[in-house]
């Protein structure tokens, strides 16, 4: 392959990558969505616009149930059942982003609120003892609150703090 062909191939590759990146829109500061599926205790699939999008709830970490080559962790199935009861498929949501809009898996990162009553889903999962706090910079808006809510659940021995 000549140098000219290598340069041409490089330019085409860069343009293709740029076009693909441009197709991935960040989450606006606030967006309406509807639940399609609950993946596990901290990951859901929603309809955003007309597209299915995977959302990772910011600030919480529920026990694993779907991680490849990883055993189902204590209280993981219960965390999944709990979020299914909070926001079953069809539930209208309001999603709020923080500083960084995607994680290293490409999932959108969001604080999730039920549209009808404003329930802060991330908080409810934490306060009922179905998650541990997970603070990853720069998405730290509620990190102190999550630590407080987890401490409260632990003191009260709710959820995983009692079972595991």
Protein language model regions, located:
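Small beta-barrel nucleic-acid-binding modules, primarily SNase/OB-fold domains
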Residues: 2-7, 14-164
């Amino acid at each position: 392959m000549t140098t000219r062909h290598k340069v041409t191939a490089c330019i085409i590759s860069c343009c293709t990558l740029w076009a693909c990146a441009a197709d991935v829109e960040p989450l606006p500061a606030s967006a309406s969505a509807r639940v399609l599926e609950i993946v596990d205790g901290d990951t859901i699939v929603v309809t955003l616009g007309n597209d299915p999008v995977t959302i990772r709830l910011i600030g919480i970490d529920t026990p694993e149930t779907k991680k490849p080559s990883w055993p189902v962790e204590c209280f993981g199935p219960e965390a999944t059942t709990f979020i299914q009861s909070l926001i079953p498929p069809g539930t209208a949501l309001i999603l709020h982003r923080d500083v960084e809009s995607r994680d290293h898996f490409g999932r959108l990162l969001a604080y999730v609120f039920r549209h009808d009553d404003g329930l802060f889903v991330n908080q409810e999962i934490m306060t009922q003892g179905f998650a541990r706090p997970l603070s990853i910079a720069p998405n730290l808006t509620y990190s102190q609150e999550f630590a407080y809510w987890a401490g409260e659940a632990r003191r009260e021995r709710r959820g995983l703090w009692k079972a595991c």
